[in-house]
Structure formats: structure tokens, C-alpha cells
From Swiss-Prot:
Subunit structure: Monomer.
Keyword Nucleus: no
Transmembrane segments: none
Organism annotation: Kribbella flavida (strain DSM 17836 / JCM 10339 / NBRC 14399)
Upper taxonomic lineage: Bacteria, Bacillati, Actinomycetota, Actinomycetes, Propionibacteriales
Domain N-acetyltransferase as annotated: residue spans: 8-162, 159-304
This protein's name: Mycothiol acetyltransferase
Length: 304
């Protein structure tokens, strides 16, 4: 086995190989091993990202353009500038030390700041984390709700709802998103580039990106961004500006988006992710019929 640590961007052929590796692992495990953010960064240049590639033997051969084909790629790990990390090993190469080697290299590059995500919390993830004395530092719940009757949203007085307009609402949305998620290490740090990445994805639909606007001031008060891929919809992100929190706007926005996914898009189920510390949001979602389908955990060194 050969390990190779490279900064962004990955060669296109290698990025394709990483995406295919993640697909094979997801097919085997029933859960995606890499987050949307990581997969978006695989084939784009984000300064500070480190990619660790594990090959069966030497790195892949070169194609006609001089880029590695990565045909023998058996493992991959990503380390972001904030210390957030993920790794995946192809199913056929597990229990052979590949995951251990990948994690050891991640620790060599950022032990003091490492935060390793394990999606679905599979048994192998707990074993690997324990081997390096990593403990659970954070939990992220994956919830699902089958199609069922919903209450109507009760809007606070003076709130209008409209669709997001790309190129017009970008800056205002980024500002409110940052304020709404000031204590959230990933969502609150979104940049113009992060937003642009999503706006150019095949799944993006502005008609499913709802903005709540103050009818008197025109200020953006909150939003509900929905996402549809396949036959499931997702409460992608709901945010409320702190000055409008406590008014019931968050619940109204949530219901508005759920009605859209269920009745306008006709989807049989809706999913969402919620941080384990956000007990208020979890309680709201449970009252609306969501139940836990999976659990993601983040491991960190015990001293962090």
C-alpha cells in the first residue's frame, strides 16, 4: 500500500476515482461515507484542504493527458482547514490496515485540531477511533418523516414569503445565515464560493428556496432551503435571523417547506440533519413526525 498526501485541487481523474470509491462504499454500507461538502471539494480548489490517497501498490498509471487514473485507489481521507475530516476505504480492502494508515496520516497533519466524522456510526468507525484514543465530541441526527397530514404554518405578522433569486439575494442570505448559525462550525462559515457551489448543482431549484421577508423593512428575516434528489426531499437548511427568533418564524418556515416537498413535489418522504445539541429543533421535528433514521458522530482527541 502507498499513501500520498496532496493539496487541492485533485487531478480530474483522481477526483472521479474518489467519487466512485465513495459510491461503492455507500452501496455496501447503506450510508454515504463522505459529506456533500467533501464531495464538492474533491473536484474544486479550496485552499487549505488536504487529500490523502491510499493505493494498492504504487499510485495509478497516467492517462494520455499525464494525469493519474487512480485505478488502484483503495482509500481516501480529507482534512479541511478547520480540522474537519472524513475517510473511506473500499469494501474489498477493509480490515487490512488501510483505515488505520489514513487516520494516522491525518493525525500527523493536524492532531490538535482533528475532528473526524463517521457517517452512520458503523462498528468499524468506533473501533478505529478507539485505536487512536479518539472520543465522541459531537452527534448529528439524520431524521426521516413519511408523507402524512401537516398543520398549516402560522406566520408572524408582517412577514412575506418569496423564492430566492440567484444573483440578487446571495449577499443578504449569507449575512443572515452567518448570524443564524454563529455557533455552528460548518453552516455559519459559508462563503460566497460555498453558496455558488450549491447554486450550480443539478438539484438546485430556486422555487424550493424560500425567503421570509419583513414587509415593513424589506429585511431578510429567515429562510428554508429545500433539496430534492431522487424520491426523497430534504430540509436542507432552515435559519432565522436572531432578531426574529422567538416569533414562531422557524416553525412556520419549516412547515412551509414541508408542504412544498410533500404536496407540490409529491415526495413520499422528507429527511433532515440536526445537531445533537439543538434540542429545541429536535423536539419540533419529532412533534412534526420525524424519527431518527441514522446517527453521525464526530470523533476528536480526548484533550481537544
Amino acid at each position: 500500500m502507498t499513501l500520498e498526501a496532496v493539496p487541492s485541487p485533485l487531478p480530474p481523474a483522481t477526483a472521479v476515482a474518489v467519487t466512485e470509491l465513495a459510491r461503492l462504499a455507500a452501496q455496501s454500507d447503506g450510508v454515504n461515507p463522505l459529506s456533500e461538502q467533501t464531495l464538492l471539494h474533491v473536484d474544486s480548489e479550496h485552499h487549505g484542504d488536504l487529500h490523502v490517497l491510499a493505493y494498492d501498490g504504487e499510485p495509478g498509471t497516467l492517462d494520455v493527458s499525464g494525469l493519474q487514473t487512480a485505478e488502484n485507489l483503495i482509500g481516501y481521507a480529507a482534512l479541511g482547514p478547520d480540522g474537519s475530516a472524513e475517510l473511506v476505504v473500499t469494501p474489498a480492502a477493509r480490515r487490512q490496515g488501510t483505515g488505520t494508515a489514513l487516520l494516522r496520516m491525518l493525525l500527523d497533519h493536524g492532531k490538535d485540531r482533528l475532528r473526524l466524522w463517521a457517517h452512520g456510526r458503523l462498528p468499524g468507525a468506533d473501533e478505529l477511533a478507539a485505536h487512536f484514543d479518539l472520543t465522541v465530541a459531537r452527534e448529528l441526527y439524520f431524521l426521516r418523516r413519511p408523507s402524512a397530514p401537516l398543520p398549516e404554518p402560522g406566520w408572524p405578522e408582517g412577514i412575506d414569503v418569496r423564492a430566492f433569486v440567484p444573483g440578487q439575494d446571495d449577499d443578504a442570505w449569507l449575512e443572515v445565515n452567518a448570524r443564524a448559525f454563529a455557533t455552528h462550525p460548518e453552516q455559519g462559515a459559508w462563503t460566497t464560493e460555498d453558496l455558488g457551489d450549491r447554486l450550480h448543482q443539478p438539484w438546485f431549484d430556486p422555487e424550493g428556496f424560500f425567503l421570509a421577508v419583513d414587509s415593513k423593512t424589506g429585511a431578510l428575516a429567515g429562510f428554508h432551503w429545500t433539496k430534492v434528489e431522487g424520491d426523497e426531499g430534504e430540509v436542507y437548511v432552515v435559519g432565522v435571523d436572531p432578531s426574529y427568533q422567538g416569533t414562531g418564524l422557524g416553525k412556520a418556515l419549516t412547515l412551509h417547506g414541508l408542504h412544498h416537498l410533500q404536496e407540490v413535489r409529491g415526495l413520499p418522504a422528507v429527511t433532515l440533519y440536526v445537531d445533537g445539541t439543538n434540542t429545541a429543533a429536535r423536539a419540533l421535528y419529532e412533534k412534526l413526525g420525524f424519527t431518527t433514521a441514522a446517527l453521525d458522530v464526530q470523533y476528536a482527541p480526548a484533550t481537544v
